[in-house]
Amino acid sequence: LGLASKGSMLNNWTPWCNSDVILCFLLMEKDQERLDRAVAQSVQSMDLFLNYIQKDGACEEGPAYWGAAAGKVYDYLQILYDASDGAFSLFGNERIRKMGEFVSRSYIGNGYVVNFADAGARLNNPSELIWNYGHAVGSREMTDFALYCLADPASGKFRNPVITGNDAYRALETVRFNPLIREAADSLNRLAATG
């Protein structure tokens, strides 16, 4: 995770593994000294990853990796934010915001993204993750994009967000924030019905 060899390439595995490992330690480790060491090592690894990312926040692996790279950075930071009762927060950091906004800035329409690296050209954007991340960093661009991803052109309505089942932490986060995005989508549906 970047700690063994200085200057090594870091990729989406760094935040992905760190978010899963830190969650397990916080939930299961009873020895405070061991927990403190795990948190310190994990934060050091994530610091290396965040310093590896360019200032524009782009994921060099392509937009298809956004959920595993920037998305897992969000998960990691939200876990530490919640575990510290808000004392630990990087959500005001510009690079963190730009990493989140990369998903909307790489989108070119009709489900397509600017394709590079080994990423696919079509992307099923995880609207609930984009909403949660955007809400945390205060990005109207991201929350608007999350709602855009819920739009159903055939019906002219906004769908309810989906609770993903393949990532337990994200599923629980979606349940926690679901009322906010659902109310925004319902509000847009009411507005469309009156217009």
Language-model segments: which ranges?
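Carbohydrate-active enzyme catalytic cores, enriched for enzymes
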Residues: A68-G195
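Aromatic-lined, polymer-binding surfaces characteristic
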Residues: L1-V113, A119-G120
